[in-house]
A protein has these predicted regions:
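Short linear capping/connector segments at secondary-structure termini
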Residues: 273-278, 397
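Class II aminoacyl-tRNA synthetase-like tRNA-binding/catalytic domains
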Residues: 2-239, 418
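A translation/RNA-centric and nucleic-acid-associated enzymatic feature enriched
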Residues: 178-256, 263, 281-441
């Protein structure tokens, strides 16, 4: 009679623990915290999907007990044991450990630097490569990943084609004062991209409806909770599209992202103590006001902004507090917008542009509008903005050969995620933030 081989213990993630109640499993992770109570140890492990409490008894499992006793924080460990329901434990389950393998023990003489206590922000940013291991930071990064996934899924579902824009560019897109200049090959000058927009205008003429998603760089000397020098943007562009088309696309995109995060990352939002009821109401249509009316709102609030001024953080916050959804501000003065923005035929002093301002004071998350399609007008605008025509000959070709009305926008990922998470500062929502005085680690 042959003996049946015993099935190996399933290797699971902490996130899956509830599916394996009363079963013996193996989990691979790191020691997050440890509590001792006489002859019992209560280690808490993390594995990137969550944290779980374990229990091991000196009497029942002496080898496992000795392996864990005195183990240092963030030591890497593989544990095997039985999952039991425990309402008092994080996540509602705990593991009764039967075997332990210590993969790497953190030295006691050089302990893990981020202890379970308060640390200063500069210290945490210096240790950002370790700070992201904490449950709060990991939750934010999972929300960011969900926002990226849902945004791309939404654009794909509408028939937009993902195209890639270059990082090195020959000229400015948003203005010369915020360019990062780099030395290119054979004494050529190049710049880090400020936006992929000009390039998606080209691919939109090839593919109809497109978007790009990637990093952008702005050498803005702004030290605020809303600014990074490197951030990610999703930028759609569509041929035969107008301002209203992009406003509606922006409403649908932001709503889809927020609802997807609220549904699929509820646990992470709860960890951040985010008021999900504020997110659940983010559905189209969003409130809209003209730039003219926005000035009136600011005047009523006692803000000194006058017609023709651009809006900064203070102005955006005042306007956003009038609404519980993102607000669309449309038709800004043409003089404050980029050279490629089309003007309103009924009021040429206005641009066919819009910004979407997030509620709760998180500022602009979308900026876009309708582009110029006239070759002659675009040449004139380049000259008015003192931009080198030779660097934009390829862009002018788009107006020479089959120009059509087209429109698009850019959505700033980090500001959007910061708003969804309710974080105080944008530096928490990107794995390795690049700011005015920080490029390390």
């Amino acid at each position: 009679m042959t003996q049946q081989a015993q099935a190996p213990m399933p290797i699971i993630t902490i996130e899956q623990a509830g599916q394996y109640a009363a079963q013996i499993v193996t989990i691979r992770g790191w020691l997050y915290n440890m509590r001792e109570s006489g002859k019992l140890l209560f280690p808490i492990f993390r594995d990137g999907t969550g944290v779980i409490q374990c229990v091991v008894s000196l009497k029942e499992q002496p080898q496992a007990f000795e392996a864990l006793k005195g183990l240092t924080q963030e030591s890497s460990v593989i544990v095997t044991g039985k999952i039991q329901a425990e309402p008092r434990a994080p996540g509602g389950y705990e593991i009764h450990i039967s075997a332990v393998e210590v993969v790497q023990r953190v030295s006691e003489s050089e302990p893990y630097p981020i202890q379970l206590k308060e640390h200063g922000v500069d210290f945490l940013l210096d240790k950002r490569h370790l700070w992201i291991r904490t449950p709060r930071q990991a939750a934010i990064l999972r929300i960011r990943a969900e926002a990226e996934r849902s945004a791309r899924n939404y654009m794909d579902s509408l028939g937009y084609t993902l195209t890639d824009a270059p990082i090195f560019t020959p000229a400015a897109c948003e203005g010369t004062t915020t360019l990062f200049e780099v030395n290119y090959i054979d004494d050529q000058k190049a710049y880090l991209t400020q936006s992929g927009q000009l390039y998606v205008e080209a691919t939109a003429a090839a593919l109809g409806k497109v978007y790009t998603f990637g990093p952008t760089f702005r050498a803005e000397k702004s030290k605020t909770r809303r600014h990074l020098t490197e951030f990610w943007m999703l930028e759609p562009e569509a041929s035969y599209a107008h301002l209203e088309d992009m406003v509606q696309l922006g409403e649908g995109l932001v709503s889809a992202v927020v609802q997807s995060v609220a549904k699929n990352r509820a646990r992470e939002l709860a960890m951040l103590e985010r008021d999900v009821s504020k997110l659940e109401k983010i559905t189209p249509p969003f409130p809209r006001i003209s730039y003219d009316d926005a000035i009136k709102v600011l005047e009523k609030a006692g803000n000194p902004a006058k017609w023709g001024d651009d809006f900064g953080g203070d102005e955006e916050t005042i306007i956003s507090k009038e609404f519980d959804k993102p607000v669309i501000i449309h038709r800004y003065p043409a003089a404050m917008k980029a050279f490629y923005m089309a003007t309103d035929p009924e009021r040429p002093e206005l641009s066919l542009s819009f910004d979407m301002i997030a509620p709760e004071g998180y500022g602009e998350i979308i900026g876009g509008g309708e582009r110029l399609s006239s070759y002659e007008t675009l040449v004139q605008r380049l000259r008015e903005h003192n931009l080198p025509e030779e660097s934009f000959q390829w862009y002018l070709d788009l107006r020479r050969y089959g120009a059509v009305p087209h429109a698009g926008f850019g959505l700033g990922l980090e500001r959007t995620v910061a708003w969804i998470c309710g974080t105080e500062h944008i530096r928490e929502v990107i794995p390795f933030p690049r700011m005015l005085y920080r490029v390390y680690p």
